[in-house]
Amino acid sequence: MKREILIIPFFGWAISRLKPISINRKLKIESLKRVIVDGGQRIREGYAVLVFPEGTRKKPEDGIGRFGNSCGVLASNEAVPIIPICHNSGKYWVNKSFKKNSGDINIVIGKPIIGSDPKKLTEEARSWIEKTYSEIN
């Protein structure tokens, strides 16, 4: 989660109680390492770790953005599956806009993706999300 969210009054304070892994998106390598190290620790403590591989919402017409490899590396290192989740919130909650449009956000949860190759895990998750995204938009 981008660390800027944690300083939003009330909302950020409440979210911080969930022990999120906050990252500085300007420091990409440091942030990736933090997700891998802190995410691995959380998994070993019994927590589920939610990774947003694109890093931001997009408009449906912009399609799926570039995926970071953190989800594949984390799943491979910790020998846990990736549970892909796809949603269309970008259709109503436009990025960099205060305005939120009303509508139903669809969320689809896929089957576990299991493997040991981080790149293949990431690509399989991306492929499923891309296909599902086109179906729900």
Locations of regions flagged by a protein language model:
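Catalytic core of membrane glycerolipid acyltransferases/transacylases, capturing the structured
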Residues: 1-29
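Non-catalytic C-terminal accessory region of glycerolipid acyltransferases
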Residues: 33-137
